């Protein structure tokens, strides 16, 4: 019966889960505002062009009564880009936010389609200062949420962008290549280089193995490529990691990390923990996003944290109170 069942990917939260996820969102939001971030709330419904020039299959679309195509927001960063371009907000500025975002996932994947997020955007500040502040506040937010074990993994969007631009693939070929990279399919990548040979052949064939301790990955990557733009991206990662040496005990890299959002242009990072299969925090630089809305390029970096995944990471350490077994914990 549709009266008592939920749409695909939607979930009720009860008792401890509802209380703790609320507390995580509240505490991180209060912390970020205390650190000088300006709170911003954006609408759940937007014109679909804010997020894409074409209809995306993983977005929730609907028509309003005037026939305008709208979308349930899949992320907040694009909305903030719209705000910067369409209002008189002065930069540099720093925003923090929390709220729901929506991604349509196939039913059999068992993933949530409604996600609770908290995040930040640092816009118009010197790049290196902004990167360090973003990563520092990400770490502090995870510590505040009492996540005991986690690790930062770094990459750089310019690496894959350089390869894709150089190869000039059609949309189907590009999607296939990214699928090979995302799945670390070495056979697929080898076969691809046999049909679309380029200066990146050695790098692409080895890409599924270019992950692990940062210095080892950097050293190996530099042996495989001599493209100036990619080498500059590797230098950028290394310089950031050197600046973070007193903040993060250990870092890893994955140069086959495919950015979750298309607007990333520079350093990207994800955070993984022991009890969560996917990254529960991700972010990066997106200096060119504002051009999409007719504004000038600005240095910008941000991150978003999946509150429900953080709850999953700390669940076993929480006191067993409020509610009974099987009641939505």
Curated annotation (Swiss-Prot):
<keyword id="KW-0963">Cytoplasm</keyword>
<comment type="pathway">
    <text>Amino-acid biosynthesis; L-histidine biosynthesis; L-histidine from 5-phospho-alpha-D-ribose 1-diphosphate: step 1/9.</text>
</comment>
<comment type="similarity">
    <text>Belongs to the class-II aminoacyl-tRNA synthetase family. HisZ subfamily.</text>
</comment>
<dbReference type="GO" id="GO:0004821">
    <property type="term" value="F:histidine-tRNA ligase activity"/>
</dbReference>
<dbReference type="InterPro" id="IPR041715">
    <property type="entry name" value="HisRS-like_core"/>
</dbReference>
<dbReference type="GO" id="GO:0005737">
    <property type="term" value="C:cytoplasm"/>
</dbReference>
<protein>
    <recommendedName>
        <fullName>ATP phosphoribosyltransferase regulatory subunit</fullName>
    </recommendedName>
</protein>
<keyword id="KW-0368">Histidine biosynthesis</keyword>
<dbReference type="GO" id="GO:0016740">
    <property type="term" value="F:transferase activity"/>
</dbReference>
<comment type="function">
    <text>Required for the first step of histidine biosynthesis. May allow the feedback regulation of ATP phosphoribosyltransferase activity by histidine.</text>
</comment>
<dbReference type="InterPro" id="IPR004517">
    <property type="entry name" value="HisZ"/>
</dbReference>
<comment type="subunit">
    <text>Heteromultimer composed of HisG and HisZ subunits.</text>
</comment>
<dbReference type="GO" id="GO:0140096">
    <property type="term" value="F:catalytic activity, acting on a protein"/>
</dbReference>
<keyword id="KW-0028">Amino-acid biosynthesis</keyword>
<dbReference type="GO" id="GO:0000105">
    <property type="term" value="P:L-histidine biosynthetic process"/>
</dbReference>
<dbReference type="GO" id="GO:0006427">
    <property type="term" value="P:histidyl-tRNA aminoacylation"/>
</dbReference>
<dbReference type="Pfam" id="PF13393">
    <property type="entry name" value="tRNA-synt_His"/>
</dbReference>
<dbReference type="InterPro" id="IPR045864">
    <property type="entry name" value="aa-tRNA-synth_II/BPL/LPL"/>
</dbReference>
<dbReference type="InterPro" id="IPR004516">
    <property type="entry name" value="HisRS/HisZ"/>
</dbReference>
């Amino acid at each position: 019966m549709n009266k008592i069942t939920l749409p695909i990917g939607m979930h009720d939260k009860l008792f401890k889960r509802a209380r703790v996820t609320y507390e995580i969102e509240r505490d991180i939001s209060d912390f970020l505002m205390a650190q000088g971030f300006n709170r911003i709330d954006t609408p759940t419904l937007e014109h679909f062009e804010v997020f894409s020039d074409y209809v995306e299959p993983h977005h929730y679309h609907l028509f309003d009564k005037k026939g305008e195509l709208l979308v349930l927001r899949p992320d907040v960063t694009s909305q903030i880009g719209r705000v910067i371009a369409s209002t008189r907000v002065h930069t540099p500025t720093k925003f923090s936010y929390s709220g729901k975002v929506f991604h349509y996932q196939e039913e059999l994947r068992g993933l949530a389609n409604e996600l609770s997020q908290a995040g930040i955007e640092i816009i118009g500040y010197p790049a290196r200062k902004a990167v360090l502040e973003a990563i520092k506040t990400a770490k502090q937010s995870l510590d505040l949420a009492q996540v005991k074990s986690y690790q930062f993994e770094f990459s750089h969007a310019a690496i894959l962008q350089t390869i894709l631009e150089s190869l000039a693939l059609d949309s189907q070929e590009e999607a296939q290549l990214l699928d090979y990279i995302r799945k670390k399919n070495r056979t697929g990548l080898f076969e691809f280089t046999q049909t679309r040979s380029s200066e990146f052949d050695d790098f692409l064939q080895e890409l599924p193995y270019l992950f692990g301790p940062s210095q080892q990955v950097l050293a190996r990557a530099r042996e495989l490529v001599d493209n100036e733009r990619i080498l500059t991206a590797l230098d950028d990662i290394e310089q950031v990691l050197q600046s973070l040496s007193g903040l993060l005990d250990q870092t890893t890299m994955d140069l086959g990390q495919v950015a979750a959002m298309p607007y990333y242009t520079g350093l990207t990072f994800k955070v993984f923990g022991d009890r969560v299969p996917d990254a529960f925090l991700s972010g990066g630089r997106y200096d060119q996003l504002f051009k999409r809305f007719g504004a000038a390029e600005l240095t910008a970096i941000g991150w978003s944290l999946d509150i429900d995944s953080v709850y999953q990471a700390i669940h076993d350490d929480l006191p067993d109170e409020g509610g009974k077994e099987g009641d939505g914990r």
